[in-house]
């Protein structure tokens, strides 16, 4: 399920507001119990919800709509608008109406969240790129022949309804009231599941974590099972021949030839740093292409695979292609980092403080501004501190998957929860209830029930490290995969990206 959480995190960057809440429910239906909503990405134990954090950049607010159903459409007001094509993506088109409707949705979210919107032209450019990326991935999944059965789709829709405390009939009524047909809703959902399946096949299945990486991770943090020294670090230098986003096939071939020529020069004994300074378009060109010492797990996956078996001073035998262009790589140096000072006391390092905690969550979004969620939870806190029952309140009001368990998250270890939640939790004594706490999931009331000191078994330490390293690699591999899909797609802009 951890892989699915990662997929959702990444896909939310390209989906319209209602789709961002719909997707977690899709995967609940596909995979059964999911990750705790508040669990940090590297954790995968309790099943208390699958709402996905909003990863925000310039355009999209960090909050989510309150319901996993479409919000009222603004498309009707454009009924007289000529539906011209603004972009061609392989064999499909994106229309001006799609672009403006999506931009309006995002602006409405920003207004609700009291966040300033970027200039309209900038917003339209960003939204158009997102629509293109969404279309590219959907087409790739369809071209790969990935199928989603009607039965799987029905389970996904049932999960959407349950998460939003609706019956299937009520969900359909909400969808149709928003202006979207039920058939369209099912089609959109099917496409997103196809994309997730493709990513699992093309990205997740190829990411591996090696025992040496786990040893290095534990050594750096002083855990049991770690080596006596610190992790091995690699100093990689690169020459980047950048390929423009809209480069033609002929341009790309010319740039590849240039990269091959630079590789031959580097392999022939030319000074790599001077070659980089003169030819690289990477951000570290002025430093001779040196990226600096990093653990292997913190290098881009393409780089790590190319240099992991090289001896210091060696140049990778082949040009490495990424979505950014062509890379010539050299392993400049390799070293063993000093061991962590805490590594000398593995017994102490393996003892951790666990917290038994429960919470009440109100998700924020267009239907629930953050200020209103704070007000409601403040009122609820007053009731509980004056004799009300926390578990009963969680069952009635919480919008997390843990609601039916009275908000219980059970015993949690350091690093298992998102930072804002964990920091607030750590300030509480057993029995205390926090003031409303804001995270990317919404607003919470947190109650600490108990604390205990416990040993973390070496096997659990290694499992934790493996999950964390895998998460880092998945993110890097996913980014590379998406850029690669984009670079291989035929994209033609038909109009200026302005209203």
From Swiss-Prot:
Pfam families: Rotamase, Rotamase_3, SurA_N
Positions of the PpiC domain: 231-333, 352-450
Main location: periplasm
Reactions catalysed: [protein]-peptidylproline (omega=180) = [protein]-peptidylproline (omega=0)
Localization: Periplasm
Keyword Chaperone set for record: yes
Keywords: Chaperone, Isomerase, Periplasm, Repeat, Rotamase, Signal
UniProt cross-references to SUPFAM superfamilies, sorted A to Z: FKBP-like, Triger factor/SurA peptide-binding domain-like
GO BP annotations, alphabetical order: Gram-negative-bacterium-type cell outer membrane assembly; protein folding; protein stabilization
Molecular function GO terms recorded: peptide binding; peptidyl-prolyl cis-trans isomerase activity; unfolded protein binding
GO cellular component, one term: outer membrane-bounded periplasmic space
Presence of the UniProt keyword Kinase in the record: no
Assigned EC number: 5.2.1.8
General function of this protein: Chaperone involved in the correct folding and assembly of outer membrane proteins. Recognizes specific patterns of aromatic residues and the orientation of their side chains, which are found more frequently in integral outer membrane proteins. May act in both early periplasmic and late outer membrane-associated steps of protein maturation.
PANTHER family registered for this protein in UniProt: CHAPERONE SURA
Domain notes per entry: The PPIase activity resides only in the second parvulin domain. The N-terminal region and the C-terminal tail are necessary and sufficient for the chaperone activity of SurA. The PPIase activity is dispensable for SurA to function as a chaperone. The N-terminal region and the C-terminal tail are also required for porin recognition.
Protein name: Chaperone SurA
Species: Cupriavidus pinatubonensis (strain JMP 134 / LMG 1197)
Taxonomic classification: Bacteria, Pseudomonadati, Pseudomonadota, Betaproteobacteria, Burkholderiales
